């Protein structure tokens, strides 16, 4: 049986449901809700949603997600991290160590971060040095570190991949998004560069026209591009629009599922 992409959810997309006044969705309900109500098979969770939680809470989340067959996969650090300024090194390394510990407790295999804007090659080189130190600490937890596309010179996929290559090792990778790829060279061009180094990709969902077409970028083109480079890891749906996210996420799920199935050989 051929491996194929798996559809998961970026939990941040459900913030409106978690913050609503009437019957807010509790964090401990997420795995069952996402599996049974949305038909998705894993969770990428922003770090701010875990703020104030205890180690016992983390273990409970891991247990619930295992029983719901909807595991936590990636812990996403919410704020950008400045890795090029040496003044920040102690705090950044400590933060990444804490994230790796939390990720292990809830069952994640990866931590994803966004880099504060890098404007020069010297700063990009400084980022590489900091990442090597950070990975040495994170390796104790057997957690991978994924770099999300950002701003500055690392907004280009090739430049971000160069950082990954310079850091080296199998615990460093990328986590691109459809949205960023669309606005930085186009989904086909950027995803071709980044997907071979990705352990998870954010399937950004903007909205749909009355005819049912996705706005701004083609979900079919995204899947076709990923298939062309042999990507078989997770696609984590994330809604960027306003209002109730369930309908657009469900439409995107169905569209992506159809595209994935169509891409599979008979």
Regions found by a protein language model. Name each.
Residues 88-110, 125-126, 130-138:
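An active-site-proximal structural segment forming one wall of the substrate-binding cleft
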Residues 39-40, 70, 108, 198, ...:
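A structural motif
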Residues 1-105, 169, 250-266:
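N-terminal pre-domain/capping segments
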Residues 103-122, 141, 145-150:
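Active-site groove signature of glycoside hydrolases
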Residues 65, 215-239:
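P-loop/Walker A phosphate-binding loop and immediately adjacent motor/lid segment at beta-alpha junctions
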Residues 23, 45-57, 80-90, 117-125, ...:
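Acidic-and-aromatic substrate-binding clefts and catalytic sites of carbohydrate-active enzymes
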Residues 6-7, 15, 36, 42-43, ...:
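Acidic/histidine-rich catalytic cores of soluble enzymes
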């Amino acid at each position: 049986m051929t491996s194929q992409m798996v559809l998961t959810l970026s939990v941040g997309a459900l913030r409106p449901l978690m913050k609503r006044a009437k019957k807010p969705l509790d964090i401990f309900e997420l795995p069952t809700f996402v599996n049974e109500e949305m038909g998705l098979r894993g969770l990428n969770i922003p770090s701010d949603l875990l703020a104030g939680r205890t180690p016992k809470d983390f273990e409970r989340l891991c247990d619930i997600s295992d029983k719901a067959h909807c595991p936590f996969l990636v812990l996403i650090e919410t704020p950008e991290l400045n890795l090029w300024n040496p003044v920040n090194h102690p705090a950044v390394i400590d933060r990444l160590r804490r994230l790796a510990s939390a990720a292990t407790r809830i069952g994640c295999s990866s931590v994803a971060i966004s880099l504060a804007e890098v404007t020069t090659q010297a700063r990009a080189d400084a980022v590489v040095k900091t990442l090597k130190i950070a990975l040495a600490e994170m390796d104790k937890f057997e957690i991978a570190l994924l770099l999300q596309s950002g701003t500055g010179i690392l907004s280009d996929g090739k430049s971000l991949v160069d950082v990954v290559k310079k850091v080296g090792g199998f615990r460093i990778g990328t986590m691109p998004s459809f949205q960023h790829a669309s606005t930085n060279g186009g989904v086909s061009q950027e995803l071709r560069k980044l997907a071979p180094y990705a352990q998870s990709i954010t399937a950004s969902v903007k909205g749909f026209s009355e005819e049912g077409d996705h706005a701004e970028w083609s979900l079919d083109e995204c899947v076709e591009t990923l298939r062309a480079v042999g990507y078989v890891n997770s696609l984590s749906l994330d809604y960027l629009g306003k209002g109730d996210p369930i309908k657009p996420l469900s439409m995107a799920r169905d569209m992506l599922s159809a595209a994935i199935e169509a891409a599979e050989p008979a």
